[in-house]
Amino acid sequence: MDTFAVFGNPINHSRSPRIHALFVAETGITHPYGRVLAPLDGFEQTLRQFFDAGGLGANITLPFKERAFSLCDQLTERGALAGAVNTIKKQPDGSLLGDNTDGIGLVSDLQRLDLLRQDSRVLLVGVGGAARGVVLPLLAYGCKVVLTNRTFPRAQKLVGFYHHVGDISALPLERLGTPDYDLIINATSTGVQGSIPPLPASLITSSVCCYDMYYQQGDTPFITWCRRQGSLRCADGLGMLVGQAASSFLLWHGVLPSVLPVLETLRAELSA
């Protein structure tokens, strides 16, 4: 059986098994890694069965990161602060350790792309599991973060978790309109449905950078929209995916694989 796997719904699109196969090729570490389509009403049971059957590590993707948090026996500091986990490790005593590597994956990719400064004004769209993992690293980097979401009380609640850490606030979608941001990050799952979050076009100018945590072959719907509004610097989340995967591999095996060669390989495969 695969002793490592990514759990999500949907999951067939995931490039995580390919990423980890490339990590294995680099490191020589045995690491059988697969995909698991977890039912929306049976994620917890599916994950427990995986570990009971000999699973050693799991990655968690949408829409289960917050639910996975509650299944862990211990949490790393960043996992606890995020309130959501994307990585789980089975400990020698059988307990489950939860971590969140999304933030380090995002910040390292934004640094690689030169899209982030310590004083960047960041609009983070969405407050689900994907967003929860990146708020703290952005604040720790020195960014001013504004949250927005279809359900505004959820954004306000998340601000309450982090107001003591850095400069963070929330605005309802209907109050967005002026280009007050250096970077707009789409942390919603709208790309999976081929749609975009309901943002006003007036947010985008040529100087506003746009980043979509989602990725696909070619531009995502969000990036296509941002380019049409005039943004000159856009990127998808493939680099974030590889970065968080490398940190997951480190948690499981104590070895940090290279990110850039894997990213270049995946980008070439997606462009073929």
From Swiss-Prot:
Alphabetized UniProt keyword annotations: Amino-acid biosynthesis, Aromatic amino acid biosynthesis, NADP, Oxidoreductase
Catalytic activity entry: shikimate + NADP(+) = 3-dehydroshikimate + NADPH + H(+)
Assembly mode: Homodimer.
NCBIfam families, sorted: aroE (TIGR00507), PRK00258.1-2 (NF001310)
Function: Involved in the biosynthesis of the chorismate, which leads to the biosynthesis of aromatic amino acids. Catalyzes the reversible NADPH linked reduction of 3-dehydroshikimate (DHSA) to yield shikimate (SA).
Signal peptide: none
Molecular function terms, GO-annotated: NADP binding; shikimate 3-dehydrogenase (NADP+) activity
Pathway: Metabolic intermediate biosynthesis; chorismate biosynthesis; chorismate from D-erythrose 4-phosphate and phosphoenolpyruvate: step 4/7
One GO cellular component, as annotated: cytosol
GO BP annotation list: amino acid biosynthetic process; aromatic amino acid family biosynthetic process; chorismate biosynthetic process; shikimate metabolic process
Name of the gene: aroE
List of residues binding NADP(+): E77, G126, V127, G128, G129, A130, N149, R150, T151, F152, P153, R154, M213, G237
Catalytic site: K65
Any one Pfam family match given in the protein's UniProt record, by short name: SDH_C
Positions contributing to shikimate binding: S14, R15, S16, T61, N86, D102, Y215
Enzyme Commission number(s) of this protein: 1.1.1.25
Gene3D superfamilies found in the cross-reference section: Leucine Dehydrogenase, chain A, domain 1, NAD(P)-binding Rossmann-like Domain
Family per similarity comment: Belongs to the shikimate dehydrogenase family.
Name of protein: Shikimate dehydrogenase (NADP(+))
